[in-house]
């Protein structure tokens, strides 16, 4: 029993899932990204990777794309929840589809941002544990300070350009900082 229990509340909604999901992403994204660069630097394979004729930005962007794709795939079961609620509702289909679509788009933007922050944290250190802790704390702080309001706006079904620009700009900034940090490390 609880406020998000569909059966006992008598109200078919998907809000509960989308209020909990960002908090799970705060832990999932740093966990997925903690090994991307930190482990390669620790084991020495980073030096081997840097001798290949591949630019640093391509390496970082490909690692980011792989981690974000995995995170996006992890979000697919959320659609199962929507269809279950869709068929439980009285009458069938009495669910706010716009809020669901906005929430999914918001989660994709949030996961993109958290993945880039996790990759940046992995760039700073050779330790996977330190990378995870740094990434999780950074994601939590950023979500608590500013991203929560923008995500909740999207979760209501309102897709505002300012929200999208914030997520995209933080993602680009984090990826650029990752490239900058790794370039400085390579030059040492």
Which positions does each model-derived feature cover?
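Secretory targeting signals
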Residues: 11-18, 24, 62-129
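Hydrophobic/aromatic residues in alpha-helical transmembrane segments
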Residues: 29-33, 45, 81, 116-117, ...
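Hydrophobic alpha-helical transmembrane segments
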Residues: 17, 46-55, 77-83, 127-129, ...
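Terminal transmembrane helical anchor/hairpin motif
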Residues: 1-12, 124, 131-188
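Transmembrane helix-loop junction
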Residues: 39, 51, 83-87, 123, ...
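Long, hydrophobic alpha-helical segments
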Residues: 16-39
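Transmembrane alpha-helix boundary signature
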Residues: 1-5, 33, 40, 80-83
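Helix-loop-helix units of permease transmembrane domains in multi-pass membrane transporters
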Residues: 36-66
């Amino acid at each position: 029993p609880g406020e998000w229990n569909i059966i006992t509340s008598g109200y078919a909604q998907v809000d509960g899932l989308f209020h909990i999901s960002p908090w799970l992403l705060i832990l999932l994204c740093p966990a997925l990204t903690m090994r991307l660069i930190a482990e390669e630097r620790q084991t020495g394979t980073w030096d081997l990777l840097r001798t290949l004729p591949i630019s640093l930005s391509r390496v970082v962007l490909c690692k980011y794309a792989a981690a974000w794709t995995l995170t996006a795939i992890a979000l697919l079961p959320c659609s199962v929840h929507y269809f279950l609620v869709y068929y439980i509702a009285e009458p069938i289909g009495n669910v706010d589809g716009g809020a669901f679509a906005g929430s999914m788009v918001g989660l994709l933007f949030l996961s993109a941002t958290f993945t880039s922050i996790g990759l940046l944290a992995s760039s700073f250190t050779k330790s996977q544990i330190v990378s995870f802790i740094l990434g999780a704390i950074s994601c939590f702080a950023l979500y608590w300070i500013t991203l929560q309001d923008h995500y909740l706006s999207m979760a209501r079904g309102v897709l505002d350009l300012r929200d999208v620009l914030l997520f995209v700009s933080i993602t680009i900034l984090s990826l650029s900082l990752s490239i900058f940090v790794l370039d400085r490390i390579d030059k040492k």
